[in-house]
UniProtKB/Swiss-Prot annotation:
Keywords: Cell membrane, Membrane
Region ranges (Disordered): 1-26
Similarity-based family: Belongs to the RGI1 family.
Gene, per the UniProt record: RGI1
Membrane topology annotation: Peripheral membrane protein
Protein known as: Respiratory growth induced protein 1
Length: 200
């Protein structure tokens, strides 16, 4: 699994001491390296410049994932990142006393108790903690549920102004949407989180 690079200036994550993002800034100059030219599919068939998708960072620790989100905000890349997290939720680790061998075989998407606890964890902890790490407002109250026999996925989307004025977003051309996908399967309590910020 690819790890996030550690910088010398990296600070431990303190959710109670994350600085909010008060004002937007211009797009970082390094972003121009991510612009690629592709052939347009419209009738003219010209060449159009588009922004390549951000590099996906993989994590297996919730704290490291939250620190990554915080660092992207500090680096002024809050509107252009993609992170994936695979982890056992804290309520499972508490239940098995941090011993993975003691995880109940029924702790999966087929258990109503597990789904209820996971929904509570996502709504009351994960999204709230991500909001602190981002430093701006998240509006992820509504979600779509996709359930198959093997997997359940909750998809959240935030296309709001994130607490900034329209004038400020227009001034720096910083319009972005956030997509959060949380899923689990019918075999184990491992939770998969996919979180991305996409400029629009």
């Amino acid at each position: 699994m690819a790890r996030a690079k550690k910088s010398k200036d990296s600070q431990p994550l303190d959710l109670n001491n994350c600085q909010p993002l008060e004002h937007l800034q211009p797009v970082p100059k390094t972003r121009s390296a991510s612009i690629i030219s592709v052939e347009s599919t419209d009738s003219e068939g010209g060449v159009v410049e588009v922004l390549a998708p951000p590099q996906v960072r993989e994590f297996d620790d919730l704290t490291a994932f939250e620190a990554f989100v915080r660092d992207e905000t500090w680096d002024n890349d809050f509107d252009y990142f993609h992170g994936r997290l695979n982890y056992y939720p804290p309520f499972i680790m508490k239940e098995c006393h941090d011993n993975l061998d003691k995880i109940k075989p029924t702790a999966n998407k087929n258990s109503r108790k597990f789904k209820r606890n996971l929904q509570h964890h996502v709504a009351r902890h994960l999204i709230k903690d991500l909001e602190k790490c981002c430093g701006y407002e998240l509006h992820m109250d509504k979600f779509d549920t996709i359930e198959t026999p093997n997997r359940i996925t909750w998809k959240f989307k935030d296309e709001s102004d994130h607490g900034f004025s329209k004038e400020e977003e227009d001034e720096y051309n910083r319009h972005w949407r956030l997509e959060l996908s949380v899923s689990c399967n019918n075999e184990n309590p491992m939770v998969e989180v996919d979180y991305k910020a996409i400029p629009i």
